[in-house]
C-alpha cells in the first residue's frame, strides 16, 4: 500500500507538469549565468541574499530551473533548511550518491555510479582532500583491525556556500579521481552577506537526539573601506550515533555479538577566517585560514579480542581505549582581477598550503587502578623505617617454609609366625594401606632372635609447614583457603639483583629485610644509585640459586598496569598554485563562455606509526630495570655486546617508530580549457579538455624516514649482503647486515613513476521547444594509481604483497542522455547513463614465490595489485519538481518533488559491484509562506532491498563457501521525515525536525557492506547474525535549532 501511494505521488507530479505545459501562456526564458559575487536582488533581506547569489545552482523549491545533466548544486540555504549536520545529511535526499561507512572512524568519502572513496573526487575550495590508502592488500592486512584512521576527511557544513555534485566521469574540474563523479565544496565569503550593509552577525544553537549533538555556530562579517572579513566558528559536541533500540541492549556485552553502538565522545571544531583587501573594483587580495579538527574518544567494546564482560564490571577489565583525530589546516592567498582584457574578463591566482592528518590511537589498559589484577595491596604490606616488612597494623610480618616429619611407633603382629626371618612374619601391605604415600621399608627394630611376638616399626610421615603471618593473622599457605594470599610472584628469590624506588624504602639504610625458609630474617644489602634524578635501591644477589637463600616479599610482582598503545598517523601535505581565467566572447551570432587555466601542486604523503608500552598506576614496589639499553657491554675485554634481557621492560617506556608505507612526493601539473557556447536560443554546446601530468618521487632516507620493518623487504629483490637469520637474537654484526639488505631492497623498490592523462567532456543542449530540452554528454576521466598501490610491500609466508611499478591509470567514460519537460510550473527530467571503467586496480593472487629465509628458500603466497580489464555501470534517473502555486493561487507556496535512481554494474562481465546502491526514490512535499514566515517539508524515502545476486564476497573461497554473495544485506524500507521552520520576528529563525517519523527499523546498504568477514573490528556473528543490530540506523529522532541574524 505504501508503494502504491508513493508512486501515485510521482504520477501526480508528472501529470500536473504535463497539464501545466499544455496550458502555459508564457514561454520560459533561458537561464543566464551570473557571477557569484553579484547580487540578483538588492532589495532582499540578508538571509535571502546568500541564496540569491547562486540562483543558477540553487536547489530551492522555488527555483524551477531545469537541472544541468548529471549535476546538482546545493547552496547554503538547502542544507540549512534540512538541518544537515554532516555530509551524510547533505546527500540524504539525493539519489545515486551515498556516503561510505567506516565504522568507528565515521564516514569515508562518497559512493557514486558503482565506485567509492578515492574514485569519487572530493575538493574543498579547489583542493583535493586526503585520499585513503586504497591498496586492497593494505586494507585486508590492516583496515579490518581498527588500527588505521584510513578515511577521507570532509568539510564543516556551516562553512559552505555551495556544494556541487557531479555524477559520471568528469575530470575537467577535479583531475585525478573523478571516475564515478565528484563533490566540490565552496566555502563562504564576506561578499555573500555584505550586499546592502557593512556588517552581518549570526548565532545558531542546535541539538540532535540521534547522537546527542550540541551545535554552536557564530558567523561575523564586516566591511570597512577597502577591507572586508568573515569568520565562521563552529563547535559540535556529541556521542555515538544511537542505533535502533539503543536503550534496550545490554551495555555489558563485548565482542562481535554486541548489539549496542560502541560509546564514543565526538567533537568537531571548525574555524573559517577570510580577510580581503579590495582597493578598486578590479583588484582583490584575500587571505584564507580554514581550520578543521574532529576527535572521537571512546571504547571499542565490539572489538573481537576482548572478553565478554556481561557479568563483570568494566573497571576491573582491560579495555581498548580509542582516540581518533582528523586535523585539516589550510592557508591560502588569492589575487583576483576583474579587468576586461582581450585574454580574460576575470583572473584568479591562488596559492594554498594544506596539511591533513588522520590519526588512530588505541590504548589497551585496565581502568580500575587498584581493582586491576596484580595492582592491589590487600594485606597492606610496607617496609618501616628499618626496612622491615610490616602490615597495616605496623607489626612485623613472619614467614616460615620448612619441611618436618612426624614419627609414629607401630607394633605389627605376626601374621606368618613360621617364617624364618622376623620381617617376613609381618603383613607390610596392611601398613602401606594404613599410610598411603608414605615410604614403608620392611624392617623391624628388634633383632631376629628377639622373643617378642610383634615387630616394632617407626613410620615417618613427612610434614610441610608454610605459613605467613601479618596484621595479627596467620595464613596457612598450604590450605585451599589461604594458598593465594602469597603467590610465587610475591616471593622474590635473592639469586638476582633488584632495583626498587626509594619511595617505598628507607634509602638512608643499606639493607632490606629478607626471610629464610626456616623462618629467620636476614638483611639483604643494597646500594643507592641515581637515575634520571631519582634514587633507587639496588639489592645484592646473595643466593646461589632460586631455591636456596632468603626471599624478599612484595605486594605483587609488577607493581604497575601495562598500557599497550599504538598511534598511527597518515599525513597529506599539499602546496598548490591555481590559475583560473574566464572570458565571454561573441563570435558572429554565437556566444562563448570560456574558462581556462592550470595548476601545479606538490603533495607529500606519509605514514608514521608509533607503538609501545608504558606503565600506569606505578606503585612503590615496582621492580625497575637496571638498564633499558638494547645491548649490554661485554663482560670480557674483547667480547661482543649482548642483548639486554630487560630492554623490553614496560618501565622503560618502550616506543618504536616505523611505517608500512614509503613516503612519496607527488607532483601534479595540469592545463584545462572549457568552452560553453550557444549557437542560438535552441542549440548550445560545451566542450572541455584537460591534460594532467603526475609524477611520484619516493623519499626514503634511512635513519631519518620512519623505518620500514626489515622483515617486510629483506631478500625481496636484492640478496646481498647475506646474513644468518637462523638465530633468534641476531648479534650486532649480523643485525647490521640484515639492515643493509633491507635498505638495498627498499632502494630497488623506490623508483620514480610518471603518469599523464587527457580528460575531456563533450555535451550539447537542444531546446527545440520552449518546454522541451534534450541534453547529451560524453566524458572521460582518470585516476592515477596511488603511491601505496604502486609501492606497498609486505612479506609473510601466508600473505605477501609485491609492489607493481607497471600499474596503469584507471579510466572511465560516461555517456548520458537527458530529456526534460519544463516551464514556469516546474520540470521533469529523465536521464539514462552508461559508464565504462577500464584498468580497475585490484589485488590478484600471483602464486608461490620462493624467498630466502633461514638459510633456505621458503615458498610465500604472493599477491600483487594489477589492472582489471573493465567494469560497466548502467542506469537511469528521474528528477521532477512542480510549484502548485503556479497552477492555482490557492496553492501558492506548495511544491512537489521526486527523485529516482536505478543502476546496475559488473566487473569483468560477471562480478557485482558492491558500491552500487539499491533502487532509491525520494518524494518531497514542501510549503513555504509567501512572506517566508514559516515553512514545512515532508520527505518520503523508499529504498529497495539489495538483491543477493548484486553482491560479491571476495573471500567466499577462503571461508569455504560455494556462494559468492553477501549474506547480510539491507532489506527494503521507507522512511518519513518532517521538517519545519518559523520566523516569529525578523531576526529569529526556529527550526525543528522529526526524522524516521514512523520509527522504522532499517539498515542501509552502505552500513551493511561495512561489516567485515574477518578481522577484529566491524564484525558480527556471521552464522547467527548477532551483533548486526549495531549497524542499524537510528529510530525516530529529533533535531532543533535557533538562529539569530543581524
Curated annotation (Swiss-Prot):
The keyword Hydrolase does not apply. Residues 196-1046 form the TBDR beta-barrel domain. Pfam families: Plug, PT, TonB_dep_Rec_b-barrel. Sequence repeats lie at residues 26-29, 30-33, 34-37, 38-41. It is a multi-pass membrane protein. Residues 26-41 are annotated as: 4 X 4 AA tandem repeats of Q-P-T-N. GO terms for cellular component: cell outer membrane. Its main location: membrane. A motif (TonB box) lies at residues 51-58. Keywords: Cell outer membrane, Membrane, Receptor, Repeat, Signal, TonB box, Transmembrane, Transmembrane beta strand, Transport. Gene3D superfamilies: TonB-dependent receptor, beta-barrel domain (2.40.170.20), TonB-dependent receptor, plug domain (2.170.130.10). Residues 61-188 form the TBDR plug domain. GO terms for molecular function: siderophore uptake transmembrane transporter activity. Residues 1-24 form the signal peptide. It comes from the Bacteria. Acts as a receptor for the hemoglobin/haptoglobin complex of the human host and is required for heme uptake. Does not bind hemoglobin alone. Belongs to the TonB-dependent receptor family. Hemoglobin/haptoglobin binding protein subfamily. This protein is subject to phase-variable expression associated with alteration in the length of the CCAA repeat region. This mechanism is called slipped-strand mispairing. Addition or loss of CCAA repeat units would change the reading frame and result in introduction of stop codons downstream of the repeat region. This may be a mechanism of regulation and a way to avoid the immunological response of the host. This is Hemoglobin-haptoglobin-binding protein A. It comes from Haemophilus influenzae. The gene is hhuA.
Amino acid at each position: 500500500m505504501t508503494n502504491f501511494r508513493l508512486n501515485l505521488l510521482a504520477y501526480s507530479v508528472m501529470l500536473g507538469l504535463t497539464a501545466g505545459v499544455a496550458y502555459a501562456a508564457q514561454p520560459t526564458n533561458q537561464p543566464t549565468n551570473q557571477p557569484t559575487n553579484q547580487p540578483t536582488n538588492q532589495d532582499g533581506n540578508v538571509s535571502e541574499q546568500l541564496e540569491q547569489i547562486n540562483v543558477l545552482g540553487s536547489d530551492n523549491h522555488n527555483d524551477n530551473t531545469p537541472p544541468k545533466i548529471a549535476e546538482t548544486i546545493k547552496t547554503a540555504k538547502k542544507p540549512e533548511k534540512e538541518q544537515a549536520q554532516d555530509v551524510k545529511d547533505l546527500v540524504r535526499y539525493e539519489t545515486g550518491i551515498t556516503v561510505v561507512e567506516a565504522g568507528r572512524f565515521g564516514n569515508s568519502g562518497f559512493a557514486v555510479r558503482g565506485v567509492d572513496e578515492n574514485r569519487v573526487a572530493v575538493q574543498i575550495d579547489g583542493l583535493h582532500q586526503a585520499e585513503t590508502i586504497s591498496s586492497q592488500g593494505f586494507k585486508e592486512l590492516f583496515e579490518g583491525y581498527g588500527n588505521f584512521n584510513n578515511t577521507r576527511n570532509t568539510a564543516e557544513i556551516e562553512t559552505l556556500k555551495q556544494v556541487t555534485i557531479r555524477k559520471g566521469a568528469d575530470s575537467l574540474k577535479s583531475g585525478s579521481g573523478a571516475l564515478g563523479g565528484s563533490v566540490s565544496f565552496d566555502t563562504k565569503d564576506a561578499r555573500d552577506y555584505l550586499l546592502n550593509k557593512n556588517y552581518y552577525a549570526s548565532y545558531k544553537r542546535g541539538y540532535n537526539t540521534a547522537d546527542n549533538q550540541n551545535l554552536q555556530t557564530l558567523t561575523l562579517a564586516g566591511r570597512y573601506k577597502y577591507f572586508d572579513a568573515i569568520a565562521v566558528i563552529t563547535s559540535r559536541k556529541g556521542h555515538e550515533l544511537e542505533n535502533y533500540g539503543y536503550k534496550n541492549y545490554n551495555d555489558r556485552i563485548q565482542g562481535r555479538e554486541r548489539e549496542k553502538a560502541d560509546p564514543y565522545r565526538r567533537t568537531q571544531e571548525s574555524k573559517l577566517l577570510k580577510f580581503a583587501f579590495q582597493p578598486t573594483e578590479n583588484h582583490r587580495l584575500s587571505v584564507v585560514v580554514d581550520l578543521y579538527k574532529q576527535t572521537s574518544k571512546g571504547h571499542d567494546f565490539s572489538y573481537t579480542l576482548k572478553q565478554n564482560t556481561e557479568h563483570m564490571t568494566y573497571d576491573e577489565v582491560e579495555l581498548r581505549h580509542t582516540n581518533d583525530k582528523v586535523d585539516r589546516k589550510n592557508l591560502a592567498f588569492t589575487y583576483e582581477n576583474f579587468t576586461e582584457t582581450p585574454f580574460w574578463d576575470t583572473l584568479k591566482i591562488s596559492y594554498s598550503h594544506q596539511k591533513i592528518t588522520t590519526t588512530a590511537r588505541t590504548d589497551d589498559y585496565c581502568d580500575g587502578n587498584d581493582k586491576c589484577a596484580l595492582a592491589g595491596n590487600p594485606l597492606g604490606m610496607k617496609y618501616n623505617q628499618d626496612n622491615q616488612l610490616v602490615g597495616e597494623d605496623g607489626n612485623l610480618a613472619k614467614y616460615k617454609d620448612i619441611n618436618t616429619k612426624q614419627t609414629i611407633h607401630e607394633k605389627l603382629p605376626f601374621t606368618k609366625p613360621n617364617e624364618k626371618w622376623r620381617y617376613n612374619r609381618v603383613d607390610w601391605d596392611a601398613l602401606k594401606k594404613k599410610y598411603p604415600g608414605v615410604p614403608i621399608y620392611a624392617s623391624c627394630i628388634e633383632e631376629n632372635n628377639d622373643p617378642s611376638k610383634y615387630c616394632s616399626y617407626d613410620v615417618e610421615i613427612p610434614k610441610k609447614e608454610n605459613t605467613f603471618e601479618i596484621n595479627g593473622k596467620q595464613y596457612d599457605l598450604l590450605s585451599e583457603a589461604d594458598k593465594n594470599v602469597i603467590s610465587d610472584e610475591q616471593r622474590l628469590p635473592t639469586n638476582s639483583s633488584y632495583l626498587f624506588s626509594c619511595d617505598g624504602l628507607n634509602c638512608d639504610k643499606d639493607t632490606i629485610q629478607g626471610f629464610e625458609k626456616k623462618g629467620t630474617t636476614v638483611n639483604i644489602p643494597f646500594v643507592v644509585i641515581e637515575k634520571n634524578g631519582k634514587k633507587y635501591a639496588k639489592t645484592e644477589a646473595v643466593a646461589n640459586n632460586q631455591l636456596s637463600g632468603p626471599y624478599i616479599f612484595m605486594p605483587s610482582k609488577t607493581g604497575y598496569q601495562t598500557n599497550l598503545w599504538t598511534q598511527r598517523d597518515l599525513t597529506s601535505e599539499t602546496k598548490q598554485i591555481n590559475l583560473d581565467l574566464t572570458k565571454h566572447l561573441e563570435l558572429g551570432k554565437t556566444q562563448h563562455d570560456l574558462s581556462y587555466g592550470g595548476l601545479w601542486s606538490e603533495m607529500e604523503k606519509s605514514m608514521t606509526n608509533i607503538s609501545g608500552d608504558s606503565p600506569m598506576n606505578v606503585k612503590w614496589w615496582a621492580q625497575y630495570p637496571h638498564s633499558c639499553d638494547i645491548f649490554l657491554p661485554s663482560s670480557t675485554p674483547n667480547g661482543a655486546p649482548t642483548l639486554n634481557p630487560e630492554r623490553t621492560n614496560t618501565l622503560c617506556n618502550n616506543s618504536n617508530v616505523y611505517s608500512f608505507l614509503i613516503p612519496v612526493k607527488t607532483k601534479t601539473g595540469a592545463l584545462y580549457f572549457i568552452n560553453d557556447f550557444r549557437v542560438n536560443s535552441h542549440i548550445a554546446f560545451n566542450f572541455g579538455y584537460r591534460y594532467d601530468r603526475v609524477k611520484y618521487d619516493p623519499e626514503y632516507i634511512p635513519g631519518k624516514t620512519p623505518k620500514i620493518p626489515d622483515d617486510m623487504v629483506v631478500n625481496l629483490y636484492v640478496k646481498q649482503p647475506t646474513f644468518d637469520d637462523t638465530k633468534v637474537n641476531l648479534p650486532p654484526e649480523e643485525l647490521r647486515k640484515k639492515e643493509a639488505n633491507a635498505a638495498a631492497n627498499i632502494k630497488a623498490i623506490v623508483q620514480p613513476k610518471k603518469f599523464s592523462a587527457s580528460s575531456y567532456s563533450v555535451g550539447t543542449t537542444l531546446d527545440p521547444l520552449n518546454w522541451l530540452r534534450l541534453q547529451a554528454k560524453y566524458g572521460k576521466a582518470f585516476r592515477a594509481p596511488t603511491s601505496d598501490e604502486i609501492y606497498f610491500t609486505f612479506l609473510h609466508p601466508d600473505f605477501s604483497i609485491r609492489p607493481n611499478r607497471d600499474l596503469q591509470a584507471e579510466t572511465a567514460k560516461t555517456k548520458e542522455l537527458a530529456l526534460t519537460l519544463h516551464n514556469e510550473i516546474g520540470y521533469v527530467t529523465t536521464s539514462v547513463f552508461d559508464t565504462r571503467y577500464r584498468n580497475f586496480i585490484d589485488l590478484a593472487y600471483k602464486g608461490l614465490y620462493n624467498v630466502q629465509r633461514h638459510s633456505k628458500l621458503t615458498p610465500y603466497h604472493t599477491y600483487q595489485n594489477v589492472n582489471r580489464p573493465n567494469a560497466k555501470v548502467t542506469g537511469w534517473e528521474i528528477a521532477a519538481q512542480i510549484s502548485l502555486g503556479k497552477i492555482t493561487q490557492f496553492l501558492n507556496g506548495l511544491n512537489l518533488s521526486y527523485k529516482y535512481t536505478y543502476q546496475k554494474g559488473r566487473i569483468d562481465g560477471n562480478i557485482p559491484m558492491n558500491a552500487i546502491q539499491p533502487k532509491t526514490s525520494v518524494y518531497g512535499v514542501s510549503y513555504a509562506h509567501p512572506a517566508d514566515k514559516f515553512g514545512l517539508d515532508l520527505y518520503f524515502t523508499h529504498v529497495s532491498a539489495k538483491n543477493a545476486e548484486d553482491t560479491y564476497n571476495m573471500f567466499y573461497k577462503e571461508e569455504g563457501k560455494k556462494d559468492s554473495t553477501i549474506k547480510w544485506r539491507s532489506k527494503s524500507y521507507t522512511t518519513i521525515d518532517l521538517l519545519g521552520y518559523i520566523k516569529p520576528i525578523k531576526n529569529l529563525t526556529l527550526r525543528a525536525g522529526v526524522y524516521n517519523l514512523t520509527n522504522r527499523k532499517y539498515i542501509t546498504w552502505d552500513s551493511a557492506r561495512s561489516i567485515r568477514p574477518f578481522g577484529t573490528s566491524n564484525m558480527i556473528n556471521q552464522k547467527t547474525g548477532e551483533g548486526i543490530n549495531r549497524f542499524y540506523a537510528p529510530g525516530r529522532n529529533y533535531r532543533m535549532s535557533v538562529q539569530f541574524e543581524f
